Amino acid sequence: MKLTLVILALVACVTAFSVPTQKVKIADKNFLEKQKFLFEIVHRIDEPLMFEEWIKMGQKLITDKAQYETFDFYMEKLWESYKLGALLPKGEFFGALVKTHHKQAYGLFNFFYYAKDWETFVRNVAWARIHVNEGMFVYALTLAVIHKPEFEGLILPQIYEIFPQYFFNSKFVYAAEKFDYEVFSKLTMYEKEYKDILYKDYSEFTGNFYFYTKDWKTWQWYKMMGLDQEWYVEDKYFLRENLSQFVNDPKYVDVVKGLKKFYMPVDYTRDIDFFNDETKMTYFTEDLGWNAYWYYLNMDYAFFLNGKQFGLDKDRRGEYWIYNVQQILARYYQERLANGFGEIPEFFWYKQIEYGYDPQLIYYNGIGYSYRKNYYDFYTYGKFEMYSQIQNFFSRVYKVLETGFYKTADGQVFDLHKPEAIKIVGNYLQGNADTFDKYFFNYYYLLAHMYFADVDYNDMEVFPNVFLNFETMLRDPFFYTFYKKFTDVFYTFKYYLKPYTQKDLFYEGITIKDVSVSKLVTYYDIVDFDVTNLLNDKMTFVDGQYIWDKALLARQARLNHKPFNFEFTIDSDKVQKGVVRVFLGPKFDEYGRVIPLDYNRKNFVQIDSFVYPFIAGTNTIKRSSKEFSWTAEDRITYTELYKYVMLASEGKYDFPLDISEPHNAFPDRLVLPKGWEQGMPMQFYFFVSPFAETYEQFSNFDYTYSSGVGSGTRFVDTKPFGYPFDRQIDESDFFVPNGFFKDVKVYYVDTFAKYFEKKYTQFGTFDYSIEY
């Protein structure tokens, strides 16, 4: 578990090379009580609250205005809606981007955020847990825990542990919700005799492997082991890459003592109803970490939060958000190349969407998510008025960029052909609360998502759709097609800025002589995700204390990579500080043609950035992918966190505030594209620029357990995100001694190939000796 700060951007990771040593804080009794409350209040979120302590606290919503720092319009409207029975009912689908849902969620968030003390907060949260829609409750609570200053260090389980229904297919969710330990125990006795006969001679299956695995894909690893999609006892440990960090902790034995664990192999979406090439990419687009990253980005920089009040303007929120969009598309494009696909399809207003999508998800109320058929025509089947508004937004933005200035409704004029105008353009594209013209730009973002989800302006009860929540929208290939419109505006803005000159890029006295890179290897490994919130059995309490004695796990194959290293050789003519940036991009397109640098700059992902104190002479810098501070390894699970809190509450464990990876970290395993067995050509670009900032990074927050959202000191310098790839490139000026390109290859290794090569002696059981 890292102690370093995770910087929230996919590539805007601008951190120090050497983070100053700081003692990790240990939670006191007061902190543990608060953490226990947060873990219990979201437990089995789609069921009635069963903790008597919190039921008593949640008898009424505190409406005394004296108990709040502010009591605003949205809070009044929420309270009125509740009294009139007009709140979104419990059990109904909640969409964060449905206008009617958003307004109620805003009011609920304010009841949480503006509470003057912990008791008022607890009473409001407990009341909302009992009376408010489950999805709306989690959305508002997540925002409050992230943004309320006095809650620094407190955490919630990951969103995929609170709502596994948003991340796993309906087949798995049904099985988890029906799980009954007593029935399971009896079934295993009968199944053992059956399996002993079935798997007695594995050689009988080798001649018919094609038929047995006719729809097999890499992530259906369980078929190669003779397993099926059913529940199995896990009598060893939670599978994850960084397992040793936990099992080597002597206290960990106490944590898992008496805990019964059950896992089920789980698959990704595949083409069941209609054929679609895009299903080849579902291991990536449906990756839990990939989707959770986008969710938490939009929680940290929620579009409706005021930048000045929450400090988000200090973090350059608009620029930061649109740059993340650009980087997500760049990373997605790299994965497309690894699978033989080309450019992300363009979005045209009056053209059919070639690829449909069936998420195969089911909401916790039993209603399946809506799907889109191949060659779907939004213009014909959608709501024309909303469609026109979305078109008008983009037309207006292009027009003001072309004219070079923008005049707001109150008469202010802004020059949009200056670099600092990216703040304005980014705010407009996100449609956030800091846009200068709120009459036009504020709600277009909501309307766009509502339109593509077939939701009308005033709809309250709507069908589930992946486009209405941040945690599900990256699953749909159409997300990348539509969001390409956002980056087109971004590139249009950059087009009017002159390319950097050699004088701009040159760092006097610094020369990158060479950078060696270790072999880049990707593979599929297997991991357990905690889905215990799907359990429906009876909860057991002893003396008022909940006994958490069972854990359900979703065991899934996911993309990963071997750790890799850089060794920089950099000459400096004097002692000085510099910022080292590392980018990874493709070399060729899907046809094997070299991609021109000026165009290819859009496809580079920044994977590292750090400050280094150069000495006079030759500097040798060694850096590992494990040191990337913006990424996270596999997280400690919800079940384990609760167990640790209870152990600490009994005085048997020192609970460190940095026990879990920051909520907004990007998954380390997705830094590299899948690659090819013969090696996929890629290229690194290394660039060193001067360090000349007046503020000290991490100076106003504790980096050991806080991500510093809204602090203004999260980033190591004030260069544009993506610098120097953020503008058009003039190749006659771009190549400078302090920049260096390195050709590499990414090799994919099939870790499951051994199951084809020889008899698998453990057929019908999980192979713990599998080498990743």
From Swiss-Prot:
Q: In the UniProt record, which residues carry a glycan?
A: N242
- Subunit structure, interactors included: Heterohexamer, composed of three subunits, alpha, beta and gamma.
The record describes the protein's role as: Larval storage protein (LSP) which may serve as a store of amino acids for synthesis of adult proteins.
Q: Where in the cell is it found?
A: Secreted, Extracellular space
One Gene Ontology term of the biological-process aspect is: energy homeostasis
Q: Is Secreted among this UniProt entry's keywords? A: yes
Protein keywords: Glycoprotein, Secreted, Signal, Storage protein
Q: What is the lineage of its organism?
A: Eukaryota, Metazoa, Ecdysozoa, Arthropoda, Hexapoda
Q: What is this protein called?
A: Larval serum protein 1 gamma chain
Q: Which organism is it from?
A: Drosophila melanogaster
